[in-house]
Amino acid sequence: MTEVYDFDQSSWYTKGSLAPILPTTYPDGRLIPQVRVIDPGLGDRKDECFMYIFLMGIIEDNDGLGPPIGRTFGSLPLGVGRTTARPEELLKEATLLDIMVRRTAGVKEQLVFYNNTPLHILTPWKKVLTSGSVFSANQVCNTVNLIPLDIAQRFRVVYMSITRLSDDGSYRIPRGVFEFRSRNALAFNILVTIRVEGDVDSSRGNLGMFKDYQATFMVHIGNFSRKKNQAYSADYCKLKIEKMGLVFALGGIGGTSLHIRCTGKMSKALNAQLGFKKILCYPLMEINEDLNRFLWRSECKIVRIQAVLQPSVPQDFRVYNDVIISDDQGLFKIL
């Protein structure tokens, strides 16, 4: 049985929207580089120099035989660094980077990025830029199938998204609780409905993910469980959620991210599941890759947030990442 409760609009009203990056061009048609700064926090951190940088641009030919042919739109998450440089200075150096791109494969298709340009202002992000980085292709590329293997490719930076980490305390992406299951527990999930502003056309993404310009995604917070395998009622869990005083915001971690801050009282068990952190970050890059790619430059805002209480999936249920077929003894079977 699933129970759904609505959060009050005041919990996301202040920071629940993202401004768009609208393409503008030079007279010759080239895109003009732009930077967007997002601050999803409350601004109570004394040192506001920590920021997350997300680069966006064109993956294009780098054979030097003529004007480069653009293959697809891509991104490069640089991660968190500390600097007092202005956003415009960071953008200028990013556009001068010579970032090579190579298509490869592991369990999934991947893209390899490495930079050949000496760093100055972007030195705090040297780990990703100078050591190279590998990402799942679906997370950082619109259409990986358009990237050739027989022609050298480079990533030309056009846009930069900066997320200021202005909340006091440490941020946490609660990966450890995503698959945590417990018998007779109630799973506490958050269902977010966002509205995309502007034109939603087939050239920018899959229209099937939108209904009336709206899309939803769900994140897992944790489980409510009692001792001796007894279950809480949904109404009791609702009271616990109300006491948490959750505040929501949209940020730019990995493209688009949901930030949740607990301003009230959290149960000891749930607090332990979350690593005793009260500032949570859920990048759509890890939750919904297709929706995240569509939102890289789009204007969007939260229109509804709901608490979803569902029975935790029993531990008896096996988690299958895929279906494997074995032909042992000449018979096909599903493992």
Curated annotation (Swiss-Prot):
InterPro entries recorded: Matrix_C, Matrix_N, Matrix_Paramyxo_C, Matrix_Paramyxo_N
GO molecular function: structural constituent of virion
UniProt entry keywords in alphabetical sequence: Viral envelope protein, Viral matrix protein, Virion
Source organism superkingdom: Viruses
Keyword Mitochondrion: no
GO biological process: virion assembly
Gene Ontology cellular-component terms listed: viral envelope
Location(s), subcellular: Virion
Function, in words: The M protein has a crucial role in virus assembly and interacts with the RNP complex as well as with the viral membrane.
Family classification: Belongs to the morbillivirus/respirovirus/rubulavirus M protein family.
Name the UniProt record assigns to this protein: Matrix protein
Taxonomic placement: Viruses, Riboviria, Orthornavirae, Negarnaviricota, Haploviricotina
